[in-house]
């Protein structure tokens, strides 16, 4: 429990530090307005006492004429303080709106930018709906925390202190009675609050789980309907929803029961203070106070009102603490996302444009058709340039997604510039894993991977991936025009270059037949296009990047036979002069590969050309002749 309390304090401290960094001038000004507003709103009780004292004195002396002046003065001061309170409240509300929305904007940017630097492993191991929950549910709870809970908590705390000082000024005897009741209220608050706090974090996590499930089902709605699993899906959602209901009910039950309990305790305390005041007045007990004034009706009546105000503020503090705890649960999750370790990149070799002068490669700023690896040497400060060719070699590579479970064993292969290498094997054999190692989505456990003779660990990941083109089986398109989606492969590409890439991929003809041609909007991952059309656009996107190395996850496996013939002609031109790795899902597309690697349980068991492997009559032969099915 102490660790959890410490974590909450650390989160709150970090939140204030972040807000101060965002608004170093405005935040202190707003806090001053909050404090002034709270103090000013508590002062009218003093004027109330003065007015009652004047009336009491006039009643005793029967001199009402002399009472009008002091009463008018105190009423005027009361109006002035109310106006000041209104002005401070307006300034606080206006400034807090700027701080809240501005901070959330900057925080969302910080979250999103940080997310772009996370390794692929993070997205493979976290539910996408849960990640979305950071930007929706957690951000909303943080908004309530910054804009409402914390300011109200400060106002209530300052009001408590202000009223406490005023009560001490009037009567310490009555104040002791109030404090005895407040101690009991504090015990109840701690008991109930600690019970609800643990459920608020569970509630945030349950919301993320629920949103993750909904997002998953939305993406797979067609599969659900094809297999008629609507009722089973509803049952699964009911279980998740029941869990969310349970933790939310527990958290809010404790939180909502606190305020009524404190209000009733406050009412009881009000009666007790009234009785105590009456007894002290009747008994003629000497008053003990900072002011030194005798106990009278003019003191007792305002004191009773302050008692109600004091208990109300105590209740507000307790209520806001629960809101703060819930908000901190969201803040804790958000800071957890921000604190996720970014993808490590210790590379220092970069990819640059070069031109050839006097037989040597010279770096240049303008765009050329020639690229080279810029390799600085720390020993003597020299720089060497290695022309980008697309020579990829793996030597005795071992890898496991979990270090304790190796899934690739002793992988050794080489792909010379311009070669086409195909990976064949059942699901789980390691085909996709090998390509994930080439682009360094994951780092190897043992062995070496060299790109143009350079250890890929020395190459900056962004530059390494810029030299690779990837075409996935499951096409991903973004909201925007067809032209924008093609240009995503190279943001500096001109319209003519994008159209040329579309022609190369065989996509130009169908694009020109779209309602707006290249300006046709793509929505919902290209749901307004056929699977084949989406695949053609993704191929054009890779073509405009013009990389020396291509990785293809059997890009044509989702395209019909007629479209495949169109695509294959473009792909043959695209692959010419490039190193190509193909993850094969059907053997008819790999016959013309220079080398075919047959994988089984993370090992290369056969390698060679199509004719060589057929002649060996091994596993590839069995797959090709249908003795085994390729998955």
Per-region residue spans from a language model:
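Membrane-integrated ABC transporters
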Residues: 1-41, 55-77, 92-96, 100, ...
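Juxtamembrane helix-loop junctions of ABC transporter transmembrane domains
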Residues: 2-4, 8, 40-56, 60, ...
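An intracellular "coupling" helix at the cytosolic face of ABC transporter transmembrane type-1 domains
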Residues: 21-24, 120-121, 139-146, 150, ...
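Alpha-helical transmembrane segments of multi-pass membrane proteins
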Residues: 33, 43, 81-100, 151-158, ...
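Helix-loop-helix
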Residues: 58-59, 166-180, 254-332, 337-341, ...
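ABC-type nucleotide-binding domain
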Residues: 64, 354-631
């Amino acid at each position: 429990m102490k660790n959890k309390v410490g974590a909450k304090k650390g989160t709150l401290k970090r939140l204030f530090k972040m807000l101060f960094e965002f608004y170093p001038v405005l935040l202190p000004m707003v806090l001053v307005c909050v404090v002034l507003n709270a103090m000013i709103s508590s002062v009218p009780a003093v004027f109330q006492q003065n007015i009652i004292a004047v009336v009491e004195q006039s009643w005793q002396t029967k001199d009402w004429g002399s009472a009008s002046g002091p009463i008018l003065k105190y009423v005027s001061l009361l109006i002035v303080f109310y106006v000041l309170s209104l002005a401070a409240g307006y300034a606080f509300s206006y400034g807090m709106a700027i701080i809240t929305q501005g901070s959330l904007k900057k925080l969302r940017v910080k979250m999103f930018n940080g997310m772009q630097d996370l390794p692929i492993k993070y997205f493979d191991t976290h539910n996408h709906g849960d990640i979305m929950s950071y930007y929706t549910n957690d951000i909303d709870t943080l908004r309530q925390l910054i804009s409402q809970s914390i300011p109200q908590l400060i106002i209530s705390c300052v009001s408590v202190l202000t009223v406490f000082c005023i009560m001490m000024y009037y009567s310490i005897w009555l104040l002791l009675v109030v404090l005895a009741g407040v101690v009991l209220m504090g015990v109840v608050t701690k008991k109930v609050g600690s019970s609800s706090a643990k459920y608020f974090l569970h509630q945030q996590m349950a919301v993320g789980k629920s949103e993750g499930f909904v997002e998953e089902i939305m993406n797979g709605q067609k599969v659900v309907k094809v297999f008629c699993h609507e009722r089973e899906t509803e049952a699964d959602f009911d279980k998740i929803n029941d869990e969310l209901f349970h933790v939310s009910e527990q958290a809010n039950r404790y939180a909502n029961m606190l305020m009524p309990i404190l209000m009733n305790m406050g009412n009881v305390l009000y009666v007790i203070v009234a009785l105590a005041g009456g007894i002290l007045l009747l008994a003629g007990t000497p008053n003990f106070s900072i002011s030194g004034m005798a106990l009278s009706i003019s003191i007792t009546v305002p004191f009773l009102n302050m008692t109600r105000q004091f208990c109300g503020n105590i209740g507000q503090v307790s209520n806001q603490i629960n809101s703060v705890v819930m908000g901190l649960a969201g803040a804790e999750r958000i800071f957890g996302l921000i604190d996720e370790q970014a993808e490590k990149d210790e590379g220092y070799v970069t990819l640059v444009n070069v031109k050839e002068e006097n037989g040597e490669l010279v770096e240049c700023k303008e765009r050329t058709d020639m690229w080279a690896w810029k390799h600085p040497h720390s020993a003597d400060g020299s720089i060497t340039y290695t022309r980008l060719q697309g020579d990829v070699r793996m030597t005795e590579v071992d890898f496991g997604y979990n270090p304790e479970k190796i899934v690739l064993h002793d992988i050794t292969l080489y792909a010379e510039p311009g070669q086409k290498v195909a990976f064949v094997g059942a699901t789980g054999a390691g085909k996709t894993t090998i390509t994930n190692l080439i682009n360094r989505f994951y780092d190897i456990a043992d062995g070496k991977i060299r790109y143009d003779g350079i250890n890929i660990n020395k190459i900056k990941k962004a530059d390494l991936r810029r030299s690779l083109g990837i075409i996935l089986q499951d096409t991903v398109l973004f909201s925007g025009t067809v032209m924008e989606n093609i240009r995503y492969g190279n943001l500096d590409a001109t319209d003519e270059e994008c159209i040329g890439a579309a022609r190369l991929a065989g996509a130009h003809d169908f694009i020109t037949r779209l309602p707006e041609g290249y300006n046709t909007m793509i929505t919902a991952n290209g749901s307004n296009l056929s699977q084949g059309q989406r695949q053609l656009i993704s191929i054009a996107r890779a073509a405009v990047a013009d990389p020396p190395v291509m990785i293809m996850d059997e890009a044509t496996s989702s395209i019909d036979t007629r479209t495949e013939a169109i695509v294959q002609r473009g792909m043959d031109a695209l692959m010419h002069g490039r190193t190509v790795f193909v993850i094969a899902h059907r053997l008819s597309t790999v016959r013309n590969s220079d080398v075919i690697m047959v994988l089984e349980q993370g090992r290369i068991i056969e390698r060679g050309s199509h004719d060589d492997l057929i002649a060996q009559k091994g596993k590839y032969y069995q797959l090709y002749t249908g003795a085994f099915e390729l998955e």
